[in-house]
């Protein structure tokens, strides 16, 4: 009898969680352009049936927003949540108000070429494409630059390269 009661309570909790998830819509404010696009891409990993007004969901949204901004050089955003009542015939709206903060700027790059790599045309050409001083750090561009260095090293037999 006790097991049946526990099963009923558990089922009720699961059903009520799904019902509340269906009644909440997530809205992000304060971003535009590439920042908004990248944050939306991070948030797209969250299924619509997982959207709830609880703190655990807010923490997940907070993490996704931070990851989306970090990739584009914004490491200290401010994120505030506001749960608004539903419009006339709608769902509750969980609003994430985002202020991206100050971006990380590239202060310098230090690429040291040794041996034959110092005069290698492919390396010298690649160095012209490195992230410029004073520009906003873009994690994707930085990783692509590193991959290009590694690719040239492997292709030309420079096996002592390191980062």
Task: Identify the role of each PLM range.
Residues 1-11:
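Bacterial N-terminal signal peptides that target proteins for export
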Residues 21-163:
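Interaction-mediating elements
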Residues 12-21:
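Hydrophobic h-region of N-terminal signal peptides that target proteins for export
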């Amino acid at each position: 009898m006790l097991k049946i009661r526990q099963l009923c309570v558990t089922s009720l909790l699961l059903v009520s969680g799904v019902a509340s998830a269906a009644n909440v819509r997530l809205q992000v404010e304060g971003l535009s352009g590439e920042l908004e696009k990248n944050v939306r891409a991070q948030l797209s990993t969250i299924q619509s049936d997982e959207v709830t007004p609880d703190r655990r969901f807010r923490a997940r949204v907070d993490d996704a927003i931070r990851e989306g901004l970090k990739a584009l050089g914004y490491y200290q955003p401010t994120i505030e949540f506001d749960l608004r009542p539903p419009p006339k015939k709608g769902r509750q709206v969980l609003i994430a108000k985002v202020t991206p903060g100050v971006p990380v700027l590239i202060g310098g790059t230090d690429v040291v070429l040794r041996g034959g790599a110092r005069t290698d045309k492919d390396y010298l050409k690649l160095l012209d494409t490195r992230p410029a001083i004073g520009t906003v750090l873009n994690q994707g561009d930085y990783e692509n630059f590193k991959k290009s260095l590694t690719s040239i090293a492997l292709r030309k037999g420079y096996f002592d390269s390191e980062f």
